[in-house]
C-alpha cells in the first residue's frame, strides 16, 4: 500500500514533465506550484461564493431581524483562514521539496524510459501523419472535379453531387480507419513495454530503502504539521466562535419572543 501511495505521488510529480515531453509545450510548473495554484483558485472561489451567500442572507428580512453582522464576521474568518494558510504553507512546501528530492532518481529513470519509447515510436507517428496527409490530398483530388461540376451545373445537380460524394467520403473514412488500426497495432508492444518498465521501477522502489525513509519522513512531517497547525487552528476557532455565539444568542432571543407571543394569545 505504501508503494502505491508513493508511486502515485511520483507520477503526480512527473506528470507535467511527461506531458511537456510529448507535447513540447510551455515549460511545466513544479508540483508545489500546481498544488498552490489549484488551492488558491479553489479557496478564493469558496470565499467569494460564501461571501455572496452571506450578503444575500444579511440583506433578507430574517437577516436584518437577527442583525448578526455576518459580513464583518465573514471577513474576520477570511483573515483567520489566510493567516492559517501563511503559517502552514512553509511546512507543506518543505514536505513537497523533500518528496521531490527523495524521488528524483525514479523520475529520472521514468523520463529515460519515456525518451526511449518516444524514439522508437516516433517513426510510426511520422508514417501515420504522412499517410493521413496523403489520404487528405487524395480526397481533395477526387472532390475538386465534383466541385467544378457543381459550379458549372444547375441546382438540380446538387442531389447528384451528394450521391457522388457519399462513396468518396466513405472510402476516406474506411482507409483512415485502416491506418488508425495499423498504428494501434504497431504501438501496442511499446505500450506493453512501458507498462512493464513502470512495474519494474515500482518493484525497485518497493525493495529500496527510499520507501521506508519516506514513510519515516512523512510521519515526522505529519507530526510537525500537527504541532504547527494547533495554534493556527486555535486562532481560527477563536475567530469563528464569536460569530456562532452571537448567532445562538440572537436565535434564542427570537425563539423566546415567539414563545411569549404565542403564550399571550
Swiss-Prot record:
Highest taxon above the source species: Eukaryota
By sequence similarity, the record places it as follows:
Belongs to the apolipoprotein A1/A4/E family.
Chief location of this protein within or outside the cell: secreted
Q: Region 10 X approximate tandem repeats: what ranges?
A: 68-265
Post-translation changes: Glycosylated. Palmitoylated.
Instruction: Describe its assembly.
Output: Homodimer. Interacts with APOA1BP and CLU. Component of a sperm activating protein complex (SPAP), consisting of APOA1, an immunoglobulin heavy chain, an immunoglobulin light chain and albumin. Interacts with NDRG1. Interacts with SCGB3A2. Interacts with NAXE and YJEFN3.
Localization per record: Secreted
The protein's matches in InterPro entries, at most eight in alphabetical order, are given as: ApoA_E, Apolipoprotein_A1/A4/E
Show the PANTHER family listed in the entry.
APOLIPOPROTEIN, APOLIPOPROTEIN A-I
From the Swiss-Prot or TrEMBL record, give the protein name.
Answer: Apolipoprotein A-I
The GO cellular component terms are: chylomicron; endocytic vesicle; extracellular vesicle; low-density lipoprotein particle; spherical high-density lipoprotein particle; very-low-density lipoprotein particle
Q: List every position bearing Methionine sulfoxide.
A: 110, 194, 241, 243
What are the record keywords, sorted?
Cholesterol metabolism, Glycoprotein, HDL, Lipid metabolism, Lipid transport, Lipoprotein, Oxidation, Palmitate, Phosphoprotein, Repeat, Secreted, Signal, Steroid metabolism, Sterol metabolism, Transport
Naturally occurring in which organism (per UniProt): Microtus ochrogaster
UniProt function note: Participates in the reverse transport of cholesterol from tissues to the liver for excretion by promoting cholesterol efflux from tissues and by acting as a cofactor for the lecithin cholesterol acyltransferase (LCAT). As part of the SPAP complex, activates spermatozoa motility.
User: What are the ranges of the sequence repeats?
Assistant: 68-89, 90-111, 112-122, 123-144, 145-166, 167-188, 189-208, 209-230, 231-241, 242-265
Q: Which GO terms describe its molecular function?
A: amyloid-beta binding; apolipoprotein A-I receptor binding; chemorepellent activity; cholesterol binding; cholesterol transfer activity; enzyme binding; heat shock protein binding; high-density lipoprotein particle binding
One Pfam family this chain carries? Apolipoprotein
Q: Which GO terms describe its biological process?
A: adrenal gland development; amyloid-beta formation; blood vessel endothelial cell migration; cellular response to lipoprotein particle stimulus; cholesterol biosynthetic process; cholesterol efflux; cholesterol homeostasis; cholesterol import
Q: Lineage in the entry? A: Eukaryota, Metazoa, Chordata, Craniata, Vertebrata
